[in-house]
Amino acid sequence: MTIWVLSLAMKNTIYHAPLTFGLYALAGVLFALYTSRVCPFLATLSTREIATQVGAVFILAWLIRHTLLRQHIWARKQQFIQLDTALLFAMSLPLALYYNLQYQFTLDSNLKVLFGMTLFGFFTGALLQLSSKLRTLRQMPQSQNLALSSDERRSLVKQLIGLIVLLISTLTVMLSMVAIKDIHWLENNPARLLDGSGKISIVKEFAFLSLVLGGYITAILVLWSRMMKEILDHQERSLQAVTQGNLQVRLPVYSNDELGNVAMLTNQMLDSLEATQNEVKTTRDVAIVSLSALAESRDNETGAHILRTQEYVKALAEYLAAFPQYSTLLTPAYIELLYKSAPLHDVGKVGIPDSVLLKPGKLTDEEFTVMKEHPRIGAQALAIAERHLGTSSFLAIAKEIALTHHEKWDGTGYPAQLQGEAIPLSGRLMALADVYDALISARVYKPAFSHDKAKAIIVEGSGHHFDPAVVEAFLAVEEKFVAIAAHFKDAA
């Protein structure tokens, strides 16, 4: 029976007429069997009488549930335990009154009718409520966050204790009623006790009630455990996203209980962490702009050069990220760090004398030797910041770019004559971006080259000055380079 009840319950949304009818039909059949086993007076009625009377009451109850109560506030709040328990209790009153007037049943028999229908109403409502909430959880988008309801907080521990107490009490009451009924029956049928058939009948009745109660209890516990697993799985997936650095994720809050409160407090903590992270990022960006502006103030380079080169680097990185050999390194977070760090590639120029840095003509060999020190100066400055502020991905990438963006693929660059993949990818990307922008920009010692001419020079340098893979990426996104150059033009 447990499997059948579960299969019905899992078809539910918030309200499902066939499901409700199926569970009401099941409750009606079981109640009809229940009555003949707990009440000696009801046991005197024929199967046809009980089936007709109980069937009529349960069909009427379902019709009321289907028409008048489907939009009831309890139904809209998925509080089906209250709704179905109250409905079947109300329907048990006229049935008990009918038995009292038609068959002169005693008060205890009438109370057994009230108890039985109310009990099956509780079980039916519990299955409908749990299955409805489970389906809602499974259909709800992972990103949707619900506020805690304004209802009074319901403790999971108290709910479990209450359910266990209710089930134990129900089992005790029902078995007691069966025992009393069987004692009455044996008193009037002593021969059944002597021939042993009475014992078998009593065992069957106890087994029937245990099976019915056990089936409902098992179905309720299975649905409840599935709902808890769904909630915990959702929260675990959210926390896994947080551990990967996504502080915009929030834990879904499904209920006003301990789990809901933990999720709400966790979300408040994530709000605070996100605000702190945003403040740190803002401070970092201000530092980047300040350092970049300092370098610009001593160089002939313009602010637009800084903007263009970081956009070039981002375009190249996003293209290469689509390839398996680069996808592990070039994650969205890493590309964002590249983009933020790129403006610091020439920060070391603040340590170059003005006589060299601002010289309008060609540098002498001695002057060029001095100029070639700016990558080391920039990397050393960022290393000092790293020692004082602690290691961070941003400072590490900024230091890489500053130190290696003048290295060449064939090992003829500076300052360390690194060759091939010994040059960090960040430096290889910036090398092409920096040269391209220098080629298309006007300087006191040269006019601005066209995109096509700059492109030809870069292609010629593939495998010598530049990483061939980066050159291929440049050719694939050259239209983006043209658009970036047009958007961030030097001021006239």
Curated annotation (Swiss-Prot):
Keywords: c-di-GMP, Cell inner membrane, Cell membrane, Hydrolase, Membrane, Transmembrane, Transmembrane helix. Its main location: membrane. Residues 226-278 form the HAMP domain. Its EC number is 3.1.4.-. Signal peptide: none annotated. One of its GO terms (molecular function) is phosphoric diester hydrolase activity. It is an enzyme of class 3 (hydrolase). It holds the Pfam family MASE10. It comes from the Bacteria. The lineage of its organism: Bacteria, Pseudomonadati, Pseudomonadota, Gammaproteobacteria, Vibrionales. GO terms for cellular component: plasma membrane. This is Cyclic di-GMP phosphodiesterase VC_1295. It catalyses: 3',3'-c-di-GMP + 2 H2O = 2 GMP + 2 H(+). SMART domains: HAMP (SM00304), HDc (SM00471). It is a multi-pass membrane protein.
